[in-house]
Amino acid sequence: MMFQITKSKLRFPLSTFTKRYSSFQAAKSVIDKAAIDGELRVFIVSGEVSGDNIGSRLMSSLKKLSPLPIRFNGVGGSLMCKKGLNSLFPMEDLAVMGVWELLPHLYKFRVKLKETIDAAVKFKPHVVVTVDSKGFSFRLLKELRARYKQQRLENCSVHFHYVAPSFWAWKGGESRLGGLSEFVDHLFCILPNEERVCREHGVEATFVGHPVLEDASEFDLVRRCKPQELKLEGLSFSEHSIPSDSTVISVLPGSRLQEVERMLPIFSKAMKLLKDPFPKLVTLIHVASNNQVDHYIGESFSEWPVPAILVPSGSTQLKYDAFGASQAALCTSGTVAVELQLAHLPSLVAYRAHFLTELLIRYKAKIPYISLPNILLDSPIIPEALFQACNPSNLASILERLLLDEKMRERQVVGAEKLIQLLHPSESRMGNSIHCTGLESHRYTPSILAASTILSYARR
């Protein structure tokens, strides 16, 4: 699908583009090479829900900044498809996490990898962008680069990877960074200090800020929504026959089918234990944008032990409104832990995996926490229930304290303010990028910074 950027759609003067384009020609940038073909071709791949969100926003920002029409191809979810991507296959086919959990899916994984490589070569992209999902992404980029050399293709596409691997979390992680430069031209880092470490190991990188910061710029995150004001499935709480003085907990079991299958039964048993201390307990079960997850939760819904309402995917504001109507949250470890902090909603992070994967994590991990807020603040601001500690009795006990202990709740709110500052790149770190785009600094989101870097990139 072709996207034409006209003068009327530009958020800043066309003269800005003319000036930028002249400098790009001299530097033989991505946009200069694309100009020869009269369009910018971007092959973009995401393998999970959080990556679909990042990818869709990057696509929007590229269309906003590019002086050329853009054509997209690759793999993504519903959000990326809404921006014009015709996904090669369902993104859920790649949503597998863990070493041992991957084994049953290896054949399908290899088939999808070959299909993606063949499609990328046929598409002849100027830019390849992979988003997170490093297992699939790095194999794709590595084999693509090998294919270029094998076919002696000149002026091959530039490779970007969005979300640097968590090298800081694993023993020996930094030592493996150097090898990335063989198939990744530029990394987009979402955490402070990652850019510096990547560059020290020979990998070009830019700290663009954490993707959830875009939620803060677009939505009202900390609005305290009274339960009776919240509309879910088209109905208010009262229309769902739920009292306005209910104790409301948001439950977020994950975005991948394998983790939801593992976590939801544990969460269900924990809610059953909370029925006695909180007789008016109600849960808001957040459903990820994943058809397999949607189906599984739908089938499990009838066995849920307390009154519950499903919060569908597709509306970020609805998600944050549901957070605002809740007194606490129980979530599987992931990006959502940061989203809950932005919403100032006290939460408990839980995680279980295959026992062999858990053993590997214990052996290889060099940090004591699993949730990003705790890692960045180097403090257990958010309680974590991991591995064997992730059992119904312990989850119920921690949630009860979280609902009743004001000091425990306040600690998370204070920590959230510190976290937001850490996740945002300072104006000085952005260098001249703000001036290159013509955007005011307060509108310089992570995806805009990434898009600007892609368009102005010139391989050394």
UniProtKB/Swiss-Prot annotation:
Gene Ontology, cellular component aspect: membrane; mitochondrion
SUPFAM superfamilies given in the database record: UDP-Glycosyltransferase/glycogen phosphorylase
Phosphoprotein is among the record's keywords: no
Reaction equation(s) it catalyzes: a lipid X + a UDP-2-N,3-O-bis[(3R)-3-hydroxyacyl]-alpha-D-glucosamine = a lipid A disaccharide + UDP + H(+)
Pathway(s): Glycolipid biosynthesis; lipid IV(A) biosynthesis; lipid IV(A) from (3R)-3-hydroxytetradecanoyl-[acyl-carrier-protein] and UDP-N-acetyl-alpha-D-glucosamine: step 5/6
Pfam families xrefs: LpxB
Domain of life: Eukaryota
Sorted UniProt keywords: Glycosyltransferase, Lipid A biosynthesis, Lipid biosynthesis, Lipid metabolism, Mitochondrion, Transferase, Transit peptide
Principal localisation: mitochondrion
Transit peptide per record: 1-58
Class of the enzyme per the UniProt entry, highest EC level: transferase
Single GO MF descriptor: lipid-A-disaccharide synthase activity
InterPro entries named among the record's database cross-references: Glyco_trans_19
E.C. number: 2.4.1.182
GO biological-process terms attached to the record: lipid A biosynthetic process; lipid X metabolic process
Cell compartment(s), UniProt: Mitochondrion
Deletion consequences: No visible phenotype under normal growth conditions, but plants lacking LPXB accumulate high levels of 2,3-diacylglucosamine-1-phosphate and UDP-2,3-diacylglucosamine.
Role summary: Condensation of UDP-2,3-diacylglucosamine and 2,3-diacylglucosamine-1-phosphate to form lipid A disaccharide, a precursor of lipid A, a phosphorylated glycolipid that in bacteria anchors the lipopolysaccharide to the outer membrane of the cell. Lipid A-like molecules in plants may serve as structural components of the outer membranes of mitochondria and/or chloroplasts, or may be involved in signal transduction or plant defense responses (Potential).
Family statement drawn from the similarity comment of this UniProt entry: Belongs to the LpxB family.
Protein name (record): Probable lipid-A-disaccharide synthase, mitochondrial
Taxonomic placement: Eukaryota, Viridiplantae, Streptophyta, Embryophyta, Tracheophyta
